């Protein structure tokens, strides 16, 4: 049966995703940066409360995926902590200056990960040669690759997603970026066995008093009286479609 991974930005979202039928959670913070490593407090809360598999992201900052030695030191510490806390997997990705998989750094993280199932995230979509990268990640032993097919969204990337899914000899190819209730059927019809979605919405702040003219963001257009959260109805509806699809092909 196809699996649905939901990207969550905190414990509250993770609990909603679990309750709605998600098969697995990618745990991040800072959606405006595409997701960075959660704090220890969030990690502890989620590992204590959530029963389905949770894979935290190991990403020390926003921006590109070519990391300094200081960045890499933080990543090594984070993956060791996540392993020791008892998570079932983690999400990482490192490229070198030329846009290839940074094999030496990835090999070190894979060794530190121990039993963790490793997802190589959408750094894959920024690499120069996706088929070579697939071979390299297979040799490294990653469990899955999260990718949009090197396009702005996964629907546009369906041709490469199909090719990767046909060629893979190891990593599961998981479609992500712009996967929604309205287009999830296209990914299932393409034979993809894992789907990644934020399935989210903007929730209003509970604050009654709202100070005007002051912002904590460098982007003055950001509405700081909303926050991103998982939409329970959307997750449930996506799982319903996946269940119907599985029944129809069996």
Curated annotation (Swiss-Prot):
Protein family (similarity comment): Belongs to the CutC family.
Protein localization: Cytoplasm
GO CC list: cytoplasm
Main localization, broad class: cytoplasm
Alphabetized GO MF terms: copper ion binding
This protein's UniProt keywords: Cytoplasm
Name of the protein this chain belongs to: PF03932 family protein CutC
Source species of the chain: Proteus mirabilis (strain HI4320)
SUPFAM superfamilies named among the record's database cross-references: CutC-like
Domain of life the protein comes from: Bacteria
InterPro entries: CutC-like, CutC-like_dom_sf
